[in-house]
């Protein structure tokens, strides 16, 4: 019968080395280093996400103005809200990709909440009956967010998954549809709440879910 093991002596023992496992780890590390993948700076990726989200929304504004779908006076009247959405998108994009942007992520969430409330409160009674069903706005907002969604997912793979980081990236992406809604839709606050903001929430949730399921290229903070 074996004598009972002394816990103190067991804890002080040096664990046996598994040379085979160590060699496999070293081989995998050397293989990763041999790939020499180009490293993109997070600032460059943040600017790219800003361009893909807020930039795409502003491009839509220029196109709508050029084809006569939006008038100059309407654009000027909505300018404060548009500026707020662009600022929210920029702060969220920067905070999502900054390694030390925790405070900026919280600021981005706060700005998104304020912007959403402003979009609802700024809407008055519609000047004309709706010419299309409300779900058209939701679908169009989701559609215009596809490109910035892909850009955000690619950028987020450069670091390990963090829920708040993914949320603010989704809020940046969702602001694109919100910009479009302020330009192309004249319906009341109920419509904004139930269709415009719904699309913003949906695209944020989709980005968080997909980002969590993707394997990161790096485990940097």
Swiss-Prot record:
<feature type="transmembrane region" description="Helical">
    <location>
        <begin position="56"/>
        <end position="76"/>
    </location>
</feature>
<feature type="transmembrane region" description="Helical">
    <location>
        <begin position="136"/>
        <end position="156"/>
    </location>
</feature>
<keyword id="KW-0472">Membrane</keyword>
<feature type="transmembrane region" description="Helical">
    <location>
        <begin position="107"/>
        <end position="127"/>
    </location>
</feature>
<protein>
    <recommendedName>
        <fullName>Carotenogenesis protein CarR</fullName>
    </recommendedName>
</protein>
<keyword id="KW-1003">Cell membrane</keyword>
<feature type="transmembrane region" description="Helical">
    <location>
        <begin position="79"/>
        <end position="99"/>
    </location>
</feature>
<keyword id="KW-0997">Cell inner membrane</keyword>
<keyword id="KW-0125">Carotenoid biosynthesis</keyword>
<feature type="transmembrane region" description="Helical">
    <location>
        <begin position="191"/>
        <end position="211"/>
    </location>
</feature>
<dbReference type="GO" id="GO:0005886">
    <property type="term" value="C:plasma membrane"/>
</dbReference>
<feature type="transmembrane region" description="Helical">
    <location>
        <begin position="166"/>
        <end position="186"/>
    </location>
</feature>
<comment type="function">
    <text>Negative regulator of the carotenoid synthesis regulon. It is probably inactivated by protoporphyrin IX in the presence of blue light. Inactivation of CarR leads to loss of negative control over the carotenogenesis protein CarQ.</text>
</comment>
<dbReference type="GO" id="GO:0016117">
    <property type="term" value="P:carotenoid biosynthetic process"/>
</dbReference>
<keyword id="KW-0812">Transmembrane</keyword>
<keyword id="KW-1133">Transmembrane helix</keyword>
């Amino acid at each position: 019968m074996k004598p009972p093991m002394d816990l103190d002596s067991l804890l002080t023992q040096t664990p046996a080395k598994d040379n085979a496992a160590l060699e496999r780890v070293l081989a995998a590390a050397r293989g990763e280093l041999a790939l020499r993948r180009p490293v993109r700076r997070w600032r460059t990726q943040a600017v790219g996400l800003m361009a893909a989200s807020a930039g795409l929304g502003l491009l839509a504004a220029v196109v709508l103005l050029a084809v006569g779908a939006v008038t100059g006076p309407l654009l000027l009247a909505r300018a404060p809200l548009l500026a707020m959405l662009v600022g929210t998108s920029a702060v969220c994009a920067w905070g999502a990709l900054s390694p030390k942007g925790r405070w900026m992520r919280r600021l981005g969430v706060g700005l998104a909440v304020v912007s959403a409330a402003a979009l609802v409160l700024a809407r008055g009674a519609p000047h004309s009956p709706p010419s299309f069903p409300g779900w058209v706005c939701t679908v169009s907002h989701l559609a215009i967010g596809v490109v910035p969604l892909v850009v955000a997912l690619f950028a987020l793979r450069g670091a390990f998954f963090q829920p708040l980081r993914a949320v603010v990236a989704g809020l940046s992406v969702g602001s694109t549809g919100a910009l479009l809604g302020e330009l192309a839709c004249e319906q009341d606050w109920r419509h904004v709440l139930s269709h415009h903001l719904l699309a913003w929430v949906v695209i944020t949730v989709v980005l968080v879910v997909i980002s969590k399921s993707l394997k990161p290229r790096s485990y940097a903070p």
